[in-house]
């Protein structure tokens, strides 16, 4: 369990809070808006109304005691930059900030953010990849080059063993697991025959995965 300082309770911040609560973490939530703070109270450990760009207020939170500080402020980039800088100056261990553009991302990284999330761009990329192919069911980028895909097994692969396909050597594609009725089966080997009633999780270079499954 981690202690999380979450600043900004717009739609993104509220969704982050809900997931953190589901995962069992301790959450201190902060927003200027009293209504937002009151609405989030049932799913967080504590919540305060305040201006995170005010250093006096921020000091009262004990920034250095949190494992992660998440700056989820939307539509007020000046406050986001100020908050990010102050958090780092006050000894925050890990600052994760939200950006809405590439320019904002670069600015946040220069001003104290350890990591930056770009939810609109990430969701746009996921949507474009997911719905431009009949075979791709889910997509998780790992870095700028590699991704996990959940894909339907191509008809030409059905009935063949993983070893016979040899896609790791020929295409750099690693078949990591099969998935049937929502359950993962990671007990696979070169001798595993690919059936027609499940999907598979594959790992590889994003461009190669798109070439193999994106049509």
Predicted regions and their residues:
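Cytosolic regulatory regions of ion transport systems
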Residues: 1-215
């Amino acid at each position: 369990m981690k202690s999380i300082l979450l600043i900004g309770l717009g739609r993104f911040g509220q969704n982050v809070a809900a997931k953190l609560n589901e995962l069992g973490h301790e959450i201190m939530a902060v927003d200027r808006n009293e209504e937002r703070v009151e609405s989030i109270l049932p799913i967080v450990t504590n919540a305060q109304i305040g201006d995170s760009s005010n250093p006096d207020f921020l000091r009262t939170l004990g920034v250095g005691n949190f494992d992660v500080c998440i700056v989820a402020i939307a539509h007020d980039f000046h406050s986001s930059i100020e908050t990010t800088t102050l958090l780092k100056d006050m000894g925050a261990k890990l600052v994760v900030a939200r950006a809405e553009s590439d320019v904002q991302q670069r600015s946040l990284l220069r001003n104290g953010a350890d990591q930056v999330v770009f939810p609109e761009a990430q969701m746009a990329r996921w949507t474009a990849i997911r719905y431009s192919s009949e075979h791709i069911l889910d997509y998780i980028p790992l870095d700028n080059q590699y991704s996990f895909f959940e894909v339907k097994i191509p008809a030409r692969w059905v009935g063949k063993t993983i070893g016979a396909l040899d896609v790791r050597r020929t295409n750099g594609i690693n078949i990591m697991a099969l998935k049937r009725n929502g359950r993962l089966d990671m007990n696979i080997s070169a001798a595993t025959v690919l059936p027609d009633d499940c999907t598979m999780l594959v790992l590889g270079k994003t461009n190669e995965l798109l070439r193999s499954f994106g049509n």
